[in-house]
């Protein structure tokens, strides 16, 4: 039986593509394994998916670009994780390893290289993260959402891989109930922050609820069940599954962080959006670079986190809505989207070519 190992985690963004690809491999008879941290979000997402995947937990350590005594302890964890991953590779003997990045992916990627397993890596951001810089050295091939320097000759620019916008969504009954609380004459805003950046949006909506709902219907995907509410012109929910795409369709404008997965989903839908990227104090600055790229391309507006107030938000919304035709046209003209099926076919072809 053909076998493949997936890895990637730390945030939902480092798991999403894996969850889209795994069912396709299973359908074609592959045995699928996943290497990550049993305490990490990757384990939660795999368990929640119900997919027939064997999960292997290994020691992982956070990768830092600055000096910290914690680096010594985490260095030992990474080394131990490599030995654990080597044992997994030698036992499973997969045809390939696919990594979506994140610090949890470093031990299995290195182990795969050491054991002669072809390594395929995906990088979503404009600047390559530290984990994927290490992975590049071990990679048979790396796929990139953004164009990268030609000197990195193992990288193929594939654009964003997304399933959103490729098919009609089925409307859950709950959507009609939500609509009954909304004013049809007002535009609808959707705030979505992702696993690492929702709190700022949650606080903003809580502090400005009256001002927001006076002018807009507001949807807030919070990640915090204590904030769940459905009231006049306001719907707040911790997590949504079947409702996600219908709510996106309902929204006139989405206010989002700058994670690559989400903003390219919005591009695929040609959905008006404002990007409020995580700042450099909370990240390596990749979301700022992603947002700058989208603004330069004419896809979106951008607000710095410290600019997130009613005055700046209203100015950005006024511009988006007044010039929506040009934003929509720029997004519709984009050639930066690849379907999951297209990417799966590419990956499979490369794995077949890479077999020894």
Curated annotation (Swiss-Prot):
Primary subcellular site in the record, as a coarse category: membrane
Source organism of this protein record: Streptococcus sanguinis (strain SK36)
Enzyme Commission designation: 2.4.1.227
Gene Ontology biological-process entries: carbohydrate metabolic process; cell division; cell wall organization; lipid glycosylation; peptidoglycan biosynthetic process; regulation of cell shape
Domain of life: Bacteria
Reactions mediated catalytically: Mur2Ac(oyl-L-Ala-gamma-D-Glu-L-Lys-D-Ala-D-Ala)-di-trans,octa-cis-undecaprenyl diphosphate + UDP-N-acetyl-alpha-D-glucosamine = beta-D-GlcNAc-(1->4)-Mur2Ac(oyl-L-Ala-gamma-D-Glu-L-Lys-D-Ala-D-Ala)-di-trans,octa-cis-undecaprenyl diphosphate + UDP + H(+)
InterPro entries hit by this protein: GlcNAc_MurG, Glyco_trans_28_C, GlycoTrans_28_N
SUPFAM superfamilies tied to this protein: UDP-Glycosyltransferase/glycogen phosphorylase
This protein's record includes keyword ATP-binding: no
Key words of the record: Cell cycle, Cell division, Cell membrane, Cell shape, Cell wall biogenesis/degradation, Glycosyltransferase, Membrane, Peptidoglycan synthesis, Transferase
Function of the protein: Cell wall formation. Catalyzes the transfer of a GlcNAc subunit on undecaprenyl-pyrophosphoryl-MurNAc-pentapeptide (lipid intermediate I) to form undecaprenyl-pyrophosphoryl-MurNAc-(pentapeptide)GlcNAc (lipid intermediate II).
Protein name as it appears in the record: UDP-N-acetylglucosamine--N-acetylmuramyl-(pentapeptide) pyrophosphoryl-undecaprenol N-acetylglucosamine transferase
Subcellular location: Cell membrane
Membrane topology: Peripheral membrane protein
Any GO MF annotation of the entry: undecaprenyldiphospho-muramoylpentapeptide beta-N-acetylglucosaminyltransferase activity
Pathway: Cell wall biogenesis; peptidoglycan biosynthesis
Annotated family: Belongs to the glycosyltransferase 28 family. MurG subfamily.
Gene name of the record: murG
Binding positions for UDP-N-acetyl-alpha-D-glucosamine per the UniProt entry: 195, 287
Coiled-coil region: none
Pfam families tied to this protein: Glyco_tran_28_C, Glyco_transf_28
One of the record's GO cellular component terms: plasma membrane
